[in-house]
Amino acid sequence: MRQYFRRKLLLYLLTFVAAVTINWMIPRFMPGDPVQSMVARARLENPEAVAALQSYYTNLFGLDVPIWQQYLNFWGALFRGDLGVSIWLFPTPVWDVLVRAVPYTLALLVPAIVLSWFAGNKFGAAAARSKWLDNTVLPIGYILTATPYMWLGILLAWSLGIVVGIFPVAGAYSFALQPTWSLTFLWSLVMHWFLPFLSLFLVAFGGWAIGMRNMIIYELEADYANYLESLGAPRRLVRRYAFRNAMLPQITGLALQLGTIVAGALVTEIVFSYPGVGYLILQAIQVQDFFLLQGAFLFIVAGVLIANFVIDIVYVIVDPRTRTGMRGATA
C-alpha cells in the first residue's frame, strides 16, 4: 500500500509541476504589457519620469531578466511562499488578495459538491426501485446535467432574482452593509450565496442521480444479486449490496468530475459577480495582472489535485478489492 501511495504522490507532484509551468507560461503569451498599463495609470507627462517609472516596475516584477531566469525565480519565490505583488492592486501582495477571495469560492464549492453527491446518489438509488420516481428523475436529471452552469445561473437570476425578486443577483452581501457578525449581515451573506450555490448543486445533482440510477439497475441484474435472490435473501439486503457496489464508480466519478465542477463554480461566480476566485480571475485578465492570474490558477490546481488524492485514499479504504490487489502485487 505504501508503494501505491508513493507512486500516486509522485504522479500528482509531476502533474502539479506541469500544470504550474503551463500556468506560468499562459499569462506571458497574452497580448498586452502590464507594465505599460501601470505607467499609463500614473498619467505622467515627463518622458524621463515615464522611462524611470517603467524601468522601476520592470525591475520590481523581475521582467528585466531572460525568460528562463524568470521561470527559475518563480519557483524560488513559490517555495518561499511568495506569490508576488498584484499589478492591479499594487502594492498589495497576491497572497492577501487571494485570502479575501478563497473563502467565498470554498463556501460555494464544498457544500455544492458534498450535498449534490450525497443527495444525487440517494435519489438515484430510490429512482431505481420506484417507477414513478424513475419517470420523473430521468428526464429532469438529463436536463439538469446537460445544462451549462452559466446558462442555469442566468436563468435562476432572472426567475428568482428579477421576476420573483426573492434573492439578490450580484455580490456577496448587500452594498449597504459592512462585514460584521450581526444577524443582518449573515442573513445577507446567505441570501447572496444561495443562487450561485443552487446553480452548482442542480447541475451536479442531475448527473449523480442518473449515474446512480443506472448503476443500481446494472447491479440488481448482476449474477450475485440473482444468486442472493435465489437463496431467498430479502430484497432489501440485495439492494443494500447493490448500493455499496454502485457507490464505487460514483467515487471514481467524483474525482473525474471535480475539475468540471470547479470550472463551473468559477463561471457561476462571474455570472453573479460573486467575489470568489473565478470573479478575481476575470478581473485579473481584464487588467493583465500576470501575478494575480498565476496565484489564482495555482490555488485551483493545488486544490483539485489535493482533493483527487484524498478521493484516491477514500477509494482504497472503501473498496477491499483494491487493498487485496495491493497485497497481491507486493507479494
Identify the residue ranges that each predicted region occupies.
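Hydrophobic aliphatic residues
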Residues: 30, 38-42, 79, 87, ...
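Hydrophobic alpha-helical transmembrane segments of membrane transport/permease proteins
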Residues: 16-69, 164-185
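N-terminal signal-anchor/signal peptide hydrophobic helix marking the start
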Residues: 6-12
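Membrane-water interface segments at the C-terminal ends of transmembrane alpha-helices
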Residues: 23-29, 74-76, 140-171, 199-205
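Residue-level recognition of pore/gate-forming positions within transmembrane alpha-helices
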Residues: 12, 20, 117, 142, ...
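Alpha-helical transmembrane segments of integral membrane proteins
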Residues: 2-3, 98, 102-134, 149, ...
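Juxtamembrane/transmembrane-helix interface segments of polytopic membrane transporters
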Residues: 19, 23, 27, 32, ...
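Short membrane-interfacial helix/loop motifs at transmembrane-helix boundaries
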Residues: 56-96, 167
